């Protein structure tokens, strides 16, 4: 039997045009999506990563930032183990909306969810409107992980997803979180369902 495969749901949220789809495309294909269009509702991609010797399949949901899709997006908070809350470092308004997005996460997602605040477009230094220091401060005040990224150059993108996933897996290993509440599932790499740690019942994958 191969190593267990952890199935972890991850969502990307944030205002329109902050680069959510470009971050996902960079992480999945290691390319910059120069002709990116606005996400209609929700888009989906997945990738298997190695975290501390464990195979983890990230099921990543890229959500629309427009208000008219809000009712569609909110259902995807449930069962998410990780949330990337993205703002544009060159757009103060997108940063100011962070508190609204955080309010949605706290009211709709599991209390065990891991949130990483992501300042995208960090390569545009001359157009920057939000400093690293002020964003790191708000992350610390709200108990969030924090990184700056550039989907264009790839800087920080891989590490952003891996950092959040490592935190999730550390919580799982330590027994801090309820796997069922987070929607985390475990199967063998052959597709056979295995038991959750400390659980006598099987999970359905």
UniProtKB/Swiss-Prot annotation:
<dbReference type="GO" id="GO:0003924">
    <property type="term" value="F:GTPase activity"/>
</dbReference>
<feature type="lipid moiety-binding region" description="S-geranylgeranyl cysteine">
    <location>
        <position position="203"/>
    </location>
</feature>
<comment type="similarity">
    <text>Belongs to the small GTPase superfamily. Rab family.</text>
</comment>
<keyword id="KW-0636">Prenylation</keyword>
<dbReference type="GO" id="GO:0140220">
    <property type="term" value="C:pathogen-containing vacuole"/>
</dbReference>
<feature type="binding site">
    <location>
        <begin position="14"/>
        <end position="22"/>
    </location>
    <ligand>
        <name>GTP</name>
    </ligand>
</feature>
<dbReference type="InterPro" id="IPR001806">
    <property type="entry name" value="Small_GTPase"/>
</dbReference>
<dbReference type="GO" id="GO:0016192">
    <property type="term" value="P:vesicle-mediated transport"/>
</dbReference>
<dbReference type="InterPro" id="IPR041819">
    <property type="entry name" value="Rab4"/>
</dbReference>
<keyword id="KW-0813">Transport</keyword>
<dbReference type="GO" id="GO:0005886">
    <property type="term" value="C:plasma membrane"/>
</dbReference>
<dbReference type="GO" id="GO:0005525">
    <property type="term" value="F:GTP binding"/>
</dbReference>
<dbReference type="InterPro" id="IPR050209">
    <property type="entry name" value="Rab_GTPases_membrane_traffic"/>
</dbReference>
<keyword id="KW-0449">Lipoprotein</keyword>
<keyword id="KW-0488">Methylation</keyword>
<feature type="lipid moiety-binding region" description="S-geranylgeranyl cysteine">
    <location>
        <position position="205"/>
    </location>
</feature>
<dbReference type="GO" id="GO:0032482">
    <property type="term" value="P:Rab protein signal transduction"/>
</dbReference>
<comment type="function">
    <text>Protein transport. Probably involved in vesicular traffic.</text>
</comment>
<dbReference type="GO" id="GO:0030100">
    <property type="term" value="P:regulation of endocytosis"/>
</dbReference>
<keyword id="KW-0653">Protein transport</keyword>
<keyword id="KW-1003">Cell membrane</keyword>
<keyword id="KW-0547">Nucleotide-binding</keyword>
<dbReference type="Pfam" id="PF00071">
    <property type="entry name" value="Ras"/>
</dbReference>
<dbReference type="InterPro" id="IPR027417">
    <property type="entry name" value="P-loop_NTPase"/>
</dbReference>
<feature type="binding site">
    <location>
        <begin position="150"/>
        <end position="152"/>
    </location>
    <ligand>
        <name>GTP</name>
    </ligand>
</feature>
<feature type="modified residue" description="Cysteine methyl ester">
    <location>
        <position position="205"/>
    </location>
</feature>
<feature type="binding site">
    <location>
        <begin position="120"/>
        <end position="123"/>
    </location>
    <ligand>
        <name>GTP</name>
    </ligand>
</feature>
<dbReference type="InterPro" id="IPR005225">
    <property type="entry name" value="Small_GTP-bd"/>
</dbReference>
<protein>
    <recommendedName>
        <fullName>Ras-related protein Rab-4</fullName>
    </recommendedName>
</protein>
<keyword id="KW-0342">GTP-binding</keyword>
<dbReference type="GO" id="GO:0055037">
    <property type="term" value="C:recycling endosome"/>
</dbReference>
<feature type="short sequence motif" description="Effector region">
    <location>
        <begin position="36"/>
        <end position="44"/>
    </location>
</feature>
<feature type="binding site">
    <location>
        <begin position="62"/>
        <end position="66"/>
    </location>
    <ligand>
        <name>GTP</name>
    </ligand>
</feature>
<keyword id="KW-0472">Membrane</keyword>
<dbReference type="GO" id="GO:0015031">
    <property type="term" value="P:protein transport"/>
</dbReference>
């Amino acid at each position: 039997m191969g190593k267990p495969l952890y199935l972890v749901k991850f969502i990307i949220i944030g205002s329109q045009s902050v680069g959510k789809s470009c971050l996902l495309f960079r992480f999945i294909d290691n390319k910059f999506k120069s002709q990116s269009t606005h996400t209609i509702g929700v888009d989906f991609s997945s990738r298997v990563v190695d975290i501390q010797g464990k195979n983890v399949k990230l099921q990543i949901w890229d959500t629309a930032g427009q208000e008219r899709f809000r009712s569609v997006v909110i259902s995807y908070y449930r069962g998410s183990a990780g949330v990337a809350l993205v703002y544009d470092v060159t757009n103060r308004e997108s940063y100011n909306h962070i508190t609204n997005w955080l309010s949605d996460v706290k009211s709709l997602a599991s209390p065990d969810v891991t949130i990483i605040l992501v300042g995208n477009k960090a390569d545009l230094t001359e157009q920057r409107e939000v400093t690293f220091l002020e964003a790191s401060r708000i992350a610390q005040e709200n108990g969030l992980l924090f990184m700056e990224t550039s989907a264009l150059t790839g800087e920080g993108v891989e590490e952003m997803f891996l950092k959040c996933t490592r935190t999730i897996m550390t919580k799982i290993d330590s027994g801090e979180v309820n796997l069922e509440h987070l929607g985390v599932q475990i199967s063998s790499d052959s597709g056979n369902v295995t038991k959750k740690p400390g659980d006598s019942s099987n999970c359905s994958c």
